[in-house]
Amino acid sequence: RSLISNYFFSDDGNFSFNLIKQIDSFPSSKFFKNYQDKFEKPEDTSKYWIKEQEKINLKNKIFFFKTHNALCKINGNKFTDINNTLAAIYIVRDPRNVVTSIANHYQITTREAFDFMKDKKRGIIEKEGDRFTGFQPLFSWDLHLKSWTENTLYPTLIIKYEDLVMDTTSTFTKVLEFIKGVTKTKNNIDKQKLLKCVENCK
């Protein structure tokens, strides 16, 4: 997210944490907390997923969003569809490294982290008072992976996290070429800005 935000939303490729805010997270609490719905269950916000995306797209411009969601249906409600999503970039990480990352992040054992990854009912939940205002279903690591990598609804670029770390410049170039293709942008990639983004985001 930092690379994309600094390339597209800065004038010169210089890194700024404020620019990261240009790429919002969806579906997060901010999109649903003003509904009058009681949201008694975590998954209740799923009924408004498409509606909120339609509202965003009324602005008739291209937005970038970060999501942890699996590409799924909850209670018959699609996470997104071809009318609201132009394309996706999916970053996949070696599951062995994911276990370590989860263990460090949540201060749990690697065994607990492994069980976390296998949990088919795993999700990220936001709650305000008695209302579940945010829900991102993760599912298990393998189901999450399949949901995006087997997607045929719209173009999906698969990027390995390890490639992004070890060979950031060429990997980010692929990302920019992909974005250029799906958005039908005529402007060439600004190589100097690209290199500056990579250097400043290290």
Name every feature range the model reports, one short phrase each.
Residues 152-178:
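Phosphate-binding beta-loop-alpha motif at adenosine-nucleotide cofactor sites
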Residues 1-159, 185:
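PAPS-dependent sulfotransferase catalytic domain
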Residues 148, 167-168, 201:
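Surface-exposed loop/turn and secondary-structure junction residues enriched for glycine/proline
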Residues 186-190:
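Short, charged, surface-exposed loops that flank catalytic or proteolytic processing sites
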Residues 9-10, 171-185:
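Non-catalytic, well-ordered alpha-helical segments in soluble enzyme domains
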Residues 192-202:
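PAPS-dependent sulfotransferase catalytic core
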